[in-house]
């Protein structure tokens, strides 16, 4: 296989939405799961129905890259994921309760909470669209398709993909 076509994990973003008192618990949860310090996320728009205004802290997130991201993903993945949780170059899935993760124990100061996991994939050469000088687009033949994303996850993490109509 051409080394430039090899797919790798770019980053994993763990995200937990919460307001006020629950936000502090969400920060502790993400710190407990990853060992990294989470960043608070702020609302951009006003949504009166949910009592949200611009600048209000509405959640937290943490980004993990490199070898630590691969190790964390192996811990977080369940045996089965749905096909609709995959896209071209990414995969998203929820962790409903952190106590479902085998290596983590219940923490009374956190309680029962869950979070979302977003996995971004890349190939060698993807940095050409992010650099400051001589930026260029990634050609369509080099982009990662949904099918390639599913195949990568099957091969590297031994998961089963459920299609529409099958149950978890």
Explain the meaning of each model-derived region.
Residues 1-168:
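Ribosome-associated RNA-binding proteins
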């Amino acid at each position: 296989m051409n080394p430039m076509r090899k797919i790798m994990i770019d980053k994993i973003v763990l995200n937990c939405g919460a307001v006020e008192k629950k936000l502090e618990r969400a920060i502790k949860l993400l710190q407990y799961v990853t060992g990294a310090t989470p960043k608070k996320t702020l609302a951009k728009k006003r949504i009166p129905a949910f009592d949200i205004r611009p600048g209000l802290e509405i959640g937290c997130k943490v980004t993990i890259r490199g070898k630590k991201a691969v190790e964390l993903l192996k811990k977080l993945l369940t045996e089965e994921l749905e096909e609709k949780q995959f896209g071209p170059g990414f995969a998203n899935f929820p962790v409903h309760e952190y106590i479902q993760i085998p290596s983590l124990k219940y923490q009374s100061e956190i309680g029962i909470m869950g979070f979302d996991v977003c996995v971004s994939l890349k190939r060698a050469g993807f940095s050409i669209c992010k650099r400051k000088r001589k930026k260029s687009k990634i050609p369509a033949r080099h982009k990662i398709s949904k099918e390639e994303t599913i195949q990568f996850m099957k091969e590297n993490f031994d998961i089963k993909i459920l299609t529409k109509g099958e149950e978890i």
